[in-house]
Amino acid sequence: LSIHFGLVSKCIPNLEGCTSISRVGRYPPVNYFFKPMMLIYSISLFFYWYNFLKLTKTDTSFIKIMIFFSIISLILYVLFLGENKVYASFFRRVGIYIYIFFTVLSQYLVSKKNFFNNQNKSLKKSFLKYKYILSLSLLIGGIILLPILIIKIDNLPGIKNIISWNYFLLIQTYFLLSYLYLRN
């Protein structure tokens, strides 16, 4: 829709970095679809984590707190997307990093606990291994890539967008692996 309305250029952002994720859903009329869908996604994340922790018996208070902050940060980010007030800018810039940090850390801790403490012997070890490797890679990659996302790079303007699009794709891949794991 953003391309159709001329809000972003026509390209493959994962490869070309022509637009940020937030720009795709920031402006009317696209934001009338993007924001509600992101809020539904946030609620879906709550149910995902609640059910996944329950099914895999990896229920810990610390992980629950991180997940709570992750989801609240995403909701605040979405609510303030497209707003021009000072506090909105703070939530747009900081909220998304809080969401990413707590999501990736939660994914890592849950994967680590499931992989190394495989108390439920019916758990498929290969899915647990892939989830653990992916979550560890996301955690290490996030630490390495964070300075690139924070500093201004004039000669490579699209690099931040390329990193963001692909990083979020990998975060979603973790959830896909969870689905495949639970399905088996």
Task: Mark where each language-model region is.
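Interfacial helix-start motif at the membrane-water boundary
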Residues: 20-42
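Hydrophobic cores of alpha-helical transmembrane segments in multi-pass inner/ER membrane proteins
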Residues: 34-47, 99-112, 167-183
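Cytoplasmic juxtamembrane regions at transmembrane-helix boundaries
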Residues: 47-69
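Alpha-helical transmembrane segments of multi-pass membrane proteins
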Residues: 1-11
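Membrane-proximal helix-loop-helix units in multi-pass membrane proteins
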Residues: 70-125
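Juxtamembrane "helix-exit" motif on the non-cytosolic side of transmembrane helices
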Residues: 53-54, 79-87, 145-156
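Terminal transmembrane helical module of multi-pass membrane proteins
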Residues: 110-184
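Transmembrane alpha-helices of multi-pass eukaryotic membrane proteins
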Residues: 30-38, 61-64, 91-97, 131-134, ...
